[in-house]
């Protein structure tokens, strides 16, 4: 398969480092870390490969007051990024796989192996030394996570939370919440160290921790390039 990519006129320039892969992503630190992770995986197979990154906002980045359960399985966190590919500005887009809409606007050419599927409940720092209140304020961005929290904390107040990982942690440390839910994969990718956190029990999102790569033209060719890092069980 690798020899096919090196000999294919559509792919050989990328594999040999003669042209950069033009990658689109959101402009958060997490999104950029995901791009570097994906390219690092590819470079294990194509050492000369390099890339140029274009970042942009999506509707979800701009509209931070809309509860996420109202826009699940939509283009909320992919529209602006995929638009760069549609316009020909970029060759590929890299997304958190769980952000993909039910019907993606571009062909999905690969989904990477899950880094970690779990959710973390991250506590405000002072709860290292004291118990949570009887009715803790718990920040969650999905119905699935909220249902798990309700089981663990029947008297808890489940409050919506939005923003980047850094913005959510800032809200936690400024006292807006007693604890918040984050994807463990996000913490790992950003090398975050929480003073006190616990891993929540399942269910987890089926694609949490995986990355999705979308393309417009030559989708079959791109699938060949990404075959070494595509997880066939995803």
Swiss-Prot record:
GO CC terms of this entry: cytoplasm
InterPro entries: HemC (IPR000860), Porphobilin_deaminase_N (IPR022417)
Record keyword Transferase present: yes
GO MF assignments: hydroxymethylbilane synthase activity
Pathway terms, separated by semicolons: Porphyrin-containing compound metabolism; protoporphyrin-IX biosynthesis; coproporphyrinogen-III from 5-aminolevulinate: step 2/4
Enzyme nomenclature, EC number: 2.5.1.61
Keywords: Porphyrin biosynthesis, Transferase
Sequence similarity: Belongs to the HMBS family.
Reported function: Tetrapolymerization of the monopyrrole PBG into the hydroxymethylbilane pre-uroporphyrinogen in several discrete steps.
Name recorded for this polypeptide: Probable porphobilinogen deaminase
């Amino acid at each position: 398969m690798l020899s096919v990519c090196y000999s294919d006129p559509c792919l050989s320039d990328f594999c040999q480092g003669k042209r950069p892969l033009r990658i689109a992503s959101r402009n958060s630190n997490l999104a950029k870390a995901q791009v570097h992770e994906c390219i690092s995986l590819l470079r294990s197979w194509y050492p000369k490969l390099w890339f140029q990154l274009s970042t942009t906002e999506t509707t979800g980045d701009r509209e931070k007051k809309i509860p996420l359960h109202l826009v699940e399985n939509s283009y909320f966190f992919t529209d602006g990024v995929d638009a760069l590919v549609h316009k020909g500005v970029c060759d590929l887009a890299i997304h958190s796989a769980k952000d993909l809409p039910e019907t993606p606007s571009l062909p999905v050419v690969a989904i990477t192996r899950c880094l970690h599927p779990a959710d973390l409940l991250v506590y405000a720092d002072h709860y290292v030394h004291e118990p949570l209140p009887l009715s803790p304020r718990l920040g969650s961005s999905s119905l699935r996570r909220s249902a798990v929290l309700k089981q663990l904390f029947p008297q808890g107040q489940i409050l919506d939370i939005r923003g980047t990982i850094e913005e959510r942690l800032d809200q936690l440390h400024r006292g807006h919440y007693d604890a918040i839910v984050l994807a463990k994969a996000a913490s790992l990718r950003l090398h975050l160290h929480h003073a006190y956190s616990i891993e929540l029990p399942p269910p987890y999102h089926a694609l949490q921790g995986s990355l999705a790569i979308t393309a417009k033209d030559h989708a079959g060719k791109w699938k060949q390039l990404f075959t070494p890092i595509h997880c066939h069980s995803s």
